[in-house]
Amino acid sequence: TIDNNQEVTNAFTNNGTITNLNNNNGGTLNDVTNSSTGTITTLTNRGTLNGTLTNENGGTIQTIENHDNIQRIDNQQGGTIDTLNNEVNGSITTFDNSGSVTNDFTNKGDITTLHNHNTGTMNNLTNATNATITTLTNDGQLTGGITNETNAQIDDIINTATLGTITNNGTITNNISNRTNATITTIANAQGATIGGVINETNATITTFDNSGLVQNNFTNQGIITTLNNNETGRLENLTNASNATITTLTNKGTLTGGITNQVNGNINTIDNQANLAKIDNSGTIGSLDNKNNAKIDRIDNQAGAEITDVSNEAGAEITTFENSGSVTNNFTNNGEIGSLTNFAQGTLNNLTNSGTGHIGTLTNEGQLNGGITNEAQTQGSPDGGKIDKIINKNTLSKIDNSGTITEIDNETNASITDLTNQSEGVIDNLKNQTDGTIDSISNQGHIKDGTNDGHIKGFVNAKPNAQ
């Protein structure tokens, strides 16, 4: 046992074995080296350790307990520290690990810079309640991951290699940055916890991001995220999936204030919205977009050149505005509420169905609407069937098949409708065919209450000539 209560002025080097090295209150050590042949069972610091505590290649320190101030710890490649604890009121300015920290590392004090270098191996790193780490960088293997406890603070986490799980119950002030080609298995942001921002760089991977807390600033994915969950208590501000980035499944059950932006060549396989979502601005590819019961999306913009495979707005769900200048490849099914749906000149829709529970305020077609519009008959709980307040056609429309209620159909100048069928349950309040508008065929088995024709109607079959 070595007890130091004063100052050791020069450097201290251990080439042998020390069972207990105690730097006590009032003690000062300057540059301590545990050499390649050295072993220290327990090093306890309650004083000041200036310079660097170096554990060289082949050296072993079984336990480091710090209660006061260590300027720098350098665990070199091939060096082993079994257990490292920075206790309450303990301060480590810099910890550089290029070797192995075998057991869990717990920080209960303050660490300014913690750097796990490319040859470094760490298991579980815990930043305990009321503890602080300014910058945490992992270039090696941090297999068990990082836990930031309640009221604990980490300013920045930077990962360039392999990191297991980041569990945040406290505050990560600035960013979690997952750098190019790096991997994080899971990020879990708990209820009441805060992360400033998240950056997943090109070719970087986050397998699961699970948010029940707050991400204050931008969340930018430039790489790959397999599963992204914004849970009931979760709040995200702006979520951007950048060019050539991929999100496999994105589920929103919480608050996504700034909405989702999917940039050119970005890919989101599935968006499952179960809560309030400000917007979806798509310039890339979205596979399935599903707005669930009682959920609301304020605005969806599918830009020119962008693609959405399937859109489903479920019963009880609401989309305030949907504007399409790109392509919706397969079915577009509305079982809920859509305030305004516009298919612009560059846009393509295929098979637009407003079901028996659906309501669309204004539906405007200026582009291609292949497969036409189907407004379905009543279903249980929907005595009037599907309802569309107004259809405005400014281009070519293959069909309108109505078994519900349409307040007005306006086929504008130079526009055309191939087949308009009003089924036995169908009600059309007003049909307008403007100058040089063309309707090839009208088949009415229901009720068309009023209409004006200033264009061309080539065929009209009225199965209910006395319908009111």
Regions found by a protein language model. Give the residues of each.
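Extracellular beta-strand-rich, repetitive "passenger/adhesive" scaffolds
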Residues: 1-468
